[in-house]
């Protein structure tokens, strides 16, 4: 990941920093994984990127997502309902206590995090197990997200709470229908000037008509 004002040249082949650890993951086109990030048993859609020093496991990340430094997505839960919640209870083999608790790991693995499209996750965010982040949401820096986040809302704090909506419900519904993240590279490139310059209502008015074909082409 490059510094401010510049960026690596990406391609349809995922760009993974040599110091990153990516295991059993499915990465889309134009994706990037930054330095010292660990990503395991997860998927990430086209255009999305994860910057430095993030940990991600058992997570589905949509397209066009932006994940800032130090994010922790689906950190492991401990068995708080048991008399002892320490590692040794479920990682018993490491302590010479017998077999690991495979049922516990199956329970943990089943509790995926799901992140929609075009989501911005700020620096140092933690997203706990089982949470769904709606498309277009913004998660403020340092937030701890313990509940689902609605599409096109801004949340922040510990625990994360609603701060505001980015757009009205009708505008959000229109953007979900237009689904820019599903456009081809060519279509997206052609629309980029409008994305930069048009206000939200003008953008919706122009591109909602085109979305009936399932893409952003004229």
Task: State the predicted function of each range.
Residues 120, 138, 154-155:
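Short-chain dehydrogenase/reductase
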Residues 134-137, 150-152:
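Conserved catalytic segment of ABC-fold P-loop ATPases
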Residues 151, 156-159:
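Acidic, glycine-centered active-site loop in nucleotide-sugar glycosyltransferases
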Residues 12, 17, 86-127, 159-218:
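C-terminal segments of enzyme domains that contribute to small-molecule binding surfaces
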Residues 77-79, 149, 165-167:
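Conserved catalytic-core motifs of eukaryotic protein kinase domains, centered on the activation segment
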Residues 123, 141, 151:
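Catalytic-loop Lys-Pro-X-Asn motif of eukaryotic-like protein kinases
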Residues 3-131:
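Flexible, glycine/small-residue-enriched loop-and-beta-strand segment within the central core
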Residues 138-140, 144:
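A generic "structured core" feature
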